[in-house]
């Protein structure tokens, strides 16, 4: 697996979950002898929703809700076979979306 790179993108609504998952991935990769770049925090996406509270009138009465999507990027440079096996066996939290690309 020489001259290859593994790029891992993580997404989650909870920043504590995503930070714990990135720490676990980085620690696993370093333990198996790979060089790690990151975690790189990417911009947080904020979706805002405005909802009318009153069922009939009073347009001034509104609630605002927000969903934040936190993202991290990890590059594993020169991964070994042990690194790939360890990453495949890794069990991450349920609220974290993981996208892996080889390049």
Swiss-Prot record:
Keywords (A to Z) from UniProt: Ribonucleoprotein, Ribosomal protein
Q: Which GO terms describe its biological process?
A: translation
Q: Is ATP-binding among this UniProt entry's keywords?
A: no
InterPro entries linked: Ribosomal_uS10, Ribosomal_uS10_CS, Ribosomal_uS10_dom, Ribosomal_uS10_dom_sf
GO MF terms on file?
Answer: structural constituent of ribosome; tRNA binding
In terms of Pfam families, this protein maps to: Ribosomal_S10
Q: Which SMART domains match?
A: Ribosomal_S10
Q: What's this chain's function?
A: Involved in the binding of tRNA to the ribosomes.
Task: Spell out the HAMAP family in the cross-references.
Answer: Ribosomal_uS10 (MF_00508)
Family in the record: Belongs to the universal ribosomal protein uS10 family.
Q: Subunit structure of this entry?
A: Part of the 30S ribosomal subunit.
Query: What's the name of the protein?
Result: Small ribosomal subunit protein uS10
The organism's taxonomic lineage, starting at the top: Bacteria, Pseudomonadati, Pseudomonadota, Gammaproteobacteria, Vibrionales
**Gene encoding the protein:** rpsJ
